A protein has these predicted regions:
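Gram-negative/organellar outer-membrane beta-barrel architecture
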Residues: 1-161, 226-227, 231-238, 314-316, ...
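C-terminal outer-membrane beta-barrel translocator/porin domains of Gram-negative envelope proteins
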Residues: 7-18, 111-291, 328, 336-341
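Short, glycine/acidic-rich beta->alpha junctions
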Residues: 48, 88, 175-179, 297-298
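C-terminal structured "cap/appendage" subdomains that terminate the fold
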Residues: 282, 287-330, 334
Length: 342
């Protein structure tokens, strides 16, 4: 009988037009105490972000079919191109999760983190300058997931529904309630042709006469609304053009996936045709004396793309054209992403 190793180390690399160059390393032990406990140390470095996290998971907490664990993390993000500031966070989270059925599971998570808005430029919006410095977030969240997809990559049928409710307050300096919902449905029309339709929406509201900081608001554009730049849609300072985030958002997408004519199926190339819509609006920026450009107008973009499941990982190129937009929106026609692990 040969004993198999339960530890592994992996490396990753990637690039996207929204996140820049990315690289990561992960060290994992899947049987720490001989009962399937998992511990993982991960480091992700990018031109616009850095993430370090240590996680531990007990798969059968209290001898039940319930997972529990913790995460310790530090993140930093360069948002100079979006709103002339950078931000970081350090903290920990406690979590537990269990399955109700084959397709339904629930996750409860408590997070305590200290965030910092720094490197604020002198020409940044008054809203950004007023929020420079540290804040503490104490957040309790609950997520329910219903997943009937046949596969996670190149899905041909099934649903994915996810709803998260979070409340921040208690020992923290931030007081807000937030909910987000995502839904997508996949259906094969005929051989190798799949249509998917989906949507998302979110709301975040303050309480106790507080305001919601930039890093707790929603931003729209890039990966979640093609045809528009990262944070290209939503409330914006009329003078500095800084993106200020919003309290309310929604998106919808319809996408057709199909084989490319004359290309052998074995090469793994797929064509994409899509329509994305969405909007982001509402914040408290006016209380800082800023003149804010804001609108609930639905933005619409349509486009084509190519996806290749290469030996080095998935590669995708999209070209989208905004059809409906506001004058102050920032657009981005091409999106490119590549990622692999080895």
């Amino acid at each position: 009988m040969v004993e198999q190793s339960t530890g592994d180390i992996s490396f990753g690399a990637g690039y996207s037009s929204t996140a820049g160059i990315l690289g990561d390393i992960s060290i994992k032990e899947r049987n720490l105490l001989g009962k399937g406990q998992e511990i993982r140390l991960g480091l992700s470095l990018g031109t616009l972000s850095t993430n370090i996290d240590l996680s531990y998971t007990e798969p059968y907490f209290l001898d039940r079919n319930m997972a529990a664990g913790f995460d310790i993390f530090r993140t930093s993000n360069d948002r100079q191109a979006v709103a002339n500031y950078s931000d970081s966070a350090i903290g920990f989270a406690l979590r537990t999760g269990w399955a109700y059925s084959e397709h339904t599971r629930q996750i409860v998570r408590y997070t305590l983190r200290q965030s910092n808005i720094y490197n604020v430029q002198p020409w940044a919006s008054y809203v950004v300058q007023a929020q420079a410095g540290y804040a503490t977030v104490s957040e309790l969240s609950e997520t329910i997931i219903w997943d009937t997809r046949d596969t996670r990559l190149n899905t041909t049928k099934g649903w994915l529904l996810r709803n998260t409710i979070a409340v921040a307050g208690a020992i923290g300096t931030e007081n807000y309630a937030r909910t987000t919902t995502d839904a997508v449905y996949f259906q094969s029309l005929f051989e190798d042709v799949v249509v998917s339709v989906g949507g998302s929406f979110g709301i975040v509201l303050p309480y106790n006469n507080s305001y919601i900081r930039l890093n707790n608001l929603f931003f729209l554009g890039g990966d979640n609304l093609r045809g528009f730049a990262v944070a290209g849609v939503g409330p914006r300072d009329a003078y500095t053009t800084d993106a200020l985030g919003g309290q309310y958002f929604y998106t919808t997408t319809a996408e057709l996936s199909f084989p490319l004519f004359g290309i052998p199926k074995e090469l793994g190339l797929l064509g994409k045709a899509f329509v994305d819509t969405g909007s982001l609006w509402g914040n408290q920026a006016s209380q800082f004396g800023a003149n804010v450009l804001d609108s609930q107008t639905m933005r619409v973009a349509t486009g084509l793309g190519i996806q290749w499941i290469s030996p080095f990982g998935p590669i995708r190129i999209d070209y989208a054209i905004p059809v409906v937009q506001e004058a102050w929106d920032k657009t981005q026609n091409f999106r490119f992403s590549f990622g692999t692990r080895f």
